[in-house]
Amino acid sequence: MVAEVSPKLAASPMKKPFGFRGKMGKWCCCCFPCCRGSGKNNMGAWRDHDDSAFTEPRYHVRREDLGKLHRAAWWGEVPRADLIVMLRGPGINKRDKKKRTALHLACANGNSEVVSLLLDRQCQLHVFDSKKRTALIKAVQCQEDECALMLLQHGTDPNLPDMYGNTALHYAVYNEDKLMAKTLLLYGADIESKNKGGLTPLLLAVHGQKQRMVKFLIKKKANLNALDRFGRTALILAVRCGSASIVSLLLQQNIDVFSQDVFGQTAEDYAVSSHHSIICQLLSDYKENQMPNNSSGNSNPEQDLKLTSEEEPQRLKGSENSQHEKVTQEPDINKDCDREVEEEMQKHGSNNVGLSENLTDGAAAGNGDGGLVPQRKSRKHENQQFPNTEIEEYHRPEKKSNEKNKVKSQIHSVDNLDDITWPSEIASEDYDLLFSNYETFTLLIEQLKMDFNDSASLSKIQDAVISEEHLLELKNSHYEQLTVEVEQMENMVHVLQK
């Protein structure tokens, strides 16, 4: 004769088998390709970090080991009125043989009604079970999002680690529960917390080849250069696991490809030793694209200076062509100045030094007019060539040396015109070269003035762009928070409709 079995008791273990349920089917020791031994180096890669913390997330429960309140929290068999009576006693935070409270059991099994009653009675939130896990960690580990949200809303700390160093965020990332991970971050979860293997949530996602979570954490500004206990970056872990898609994703973030682990190996070294040809090609292409930037950063300053000096005449020539219309529309004083220079050259064909002194003196005196043209002290009509005070200088040979020193000191005081030099042998140069230097001097000052105005405008534009970007970031953050709240409300409505 077959013994009768209570249908209620028989259904419970079948409904939620320990360690496995419909949505928890991925909790097994072969959840990663590297655990299944695909690839030459993958098995060793996963053995670097213990996977036991993530296996069998649900509690093993025997009915005879639980008290009345713990049974009600786990199975939810007790009517609400009786449960309220139980919660009036002093044993609301009582633990069973494995240090589990009623809150642990209710969260692990998704009994949100019991969790709500326990929270209303102000039960302790930060009690640890035998594996130093809080009720929040159990709720996240078992993917009971509604219970986890209630705990967070009542002030549960999301950064308390278990005996493996994993926080609630580590388990959300392992479960690929993007909504739960986003909720934890909104409630202050540390995105850079490390477990005992030195894995941050991002490194854990890379190690598990969870590309969706890797993208999410990169978007949340996770540190791409974080190191595990072996000094390995996210890129090295992705290479060791043979995930070309994650390697490509990380390379798009301009990650350091030359970082070495404690064994002195780089990502490329592991790719070569594991014969991952696709990854080798990705790394090679990335380094080739980065090479121009590195070579320009390590170039010789003397060579750069030489190239600049060689390119200066071409730059000035191009500037002269591009600004031809502007130069032709200058005020009449510029035309007078050019006419005066030509006439002076004809009158004083034998005195090079005097003309050079007048030109430089006039250029130095032009600071008040933006540095474009020399200033004149007196002008009676257009055909007047130079002021009387300047013409008299040509009849005073004993003052030439003093005037030369004055001109040199004025030239050296112009900080932005270092490219224009006046040699001491200028007295022996011909008038054509001197006149060419004068035109170059005038064009360069005009170019510098225009560059200064462009820089001011550019600065204003950049400030406006930065302000808009900051405003956009604030709007995106607010939108994400509203999205999470809407999804949570939809989940709660769905639960209430059942």
UniProtKB/Swiss-Prot annotation:
InterPro entries: Ankyrin_repeat_domain, Ankyrin_rpt, Ankyrin_rpt-contain_sf. Residues 469-497 form a coiled coil. Belongs to the POTE family. Keywords: ANK repeat, Coiled coil, Repeat. Gene3D superfamilies: Ankyrin repeat-containing domain. ANK repeats lie at residues 98-127, 131-160, 164-193, 197-226, 230-259. The lineage of its organism: Eukaryota, Metazoa, Chordata, Craniata, Vertebrata. It comes from Homo sapiens. Residues 289-410 are annotated as: Disordered. It comes from the Eukaryota. The gene is POTEA. Residues 290-302, 348-359 have a biased composition (Polar residues). Pfam families: Ank_2 (PF12796). Residues 303-338, 392-406 have a biased composition (Basic and acidic residues). This is POTE ankyrin domain family member A. The keyword Repeat applies.
